[in-house]
């Protein structure tokens, strides 16, 4: 499917509009190669800072973190990158802190990061075993997020 999309995009060389790729970050190396030279901006959602949380909550692949990191590094080599991080209650240290430390260390302090507080416990999560996710972020959580972001050293973070 990605090859068909890429073909359609390349057949419109007259457009001056940037091509924006919005993804959960779980895609193949082949997809990344196809996107190279076509996409101007890549936005990847980086939700979990470790594989254990990713698999437990979202049934993500067991190598979730390495896939996201691989695709972020590749995307940064051929496009602008925006990383979106949804803050989950109970996952500030195990996920948020790990994600921000990785970004600073491996992608640089000026990579665009959007830290989002919009998490709402809805739908099936209220019936799930994920007790930490059955609440919104508290005021204390939000204050800790700001502290974690400051400590990360990232310089291009929006909320």
Q: What positions do the PLM features span?
A:
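A structural motif corresponding to the C-terminal lobe/cap of the Radical SAM core domain
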Residues: 131-147
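Domain-scale selection of a single, long terminal region
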Residues: 123, 134-135, 154
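A general structural signal for short secondary-structure boundary/capping elements
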Residues: 69, 130-131, 158-159
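A cross-taxonomic marker for long C-terminal extensions/tails that follow the last structured domain
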Residues: 143-159
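Conserved AdoMet/S-adenosylmethionine-binding subsite of the radical SAM
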Residues: 1-127
């Amino acid at each position: 499917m990605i090859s068909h999309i890429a073909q359609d995009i390349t057949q419109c060389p007259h457009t001056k509009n940037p091509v924006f790729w919005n993804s959960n970050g779980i895609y193949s190396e082949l997809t990344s190669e196809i996107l190279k030279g076509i996409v101007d901006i890549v936005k990847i959602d980086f939700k979990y800072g470790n594989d254990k949380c990713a698999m437990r909550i979202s049934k993500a692949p067991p190598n979730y973190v390495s896939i996201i990191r691989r695709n972020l590094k590749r995307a940064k080599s051929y496009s602008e990158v925006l990383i979106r991080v949804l803050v989950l209650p109970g996952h500030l240290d195990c996920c948020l802190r790990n994600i921000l430390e990785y970004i600073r260390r491996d992608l640089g302090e000026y990579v665009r990061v959007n830290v989002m507080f919009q998490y709402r416990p809805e739908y099936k999560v209220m019936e799930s075993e994920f007790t930490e996710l059955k609440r919104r972020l508290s005021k204390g959580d939000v204050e800790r997020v700001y502290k974690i972001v400051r400590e990360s050293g990232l310089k291009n973070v929006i909320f």
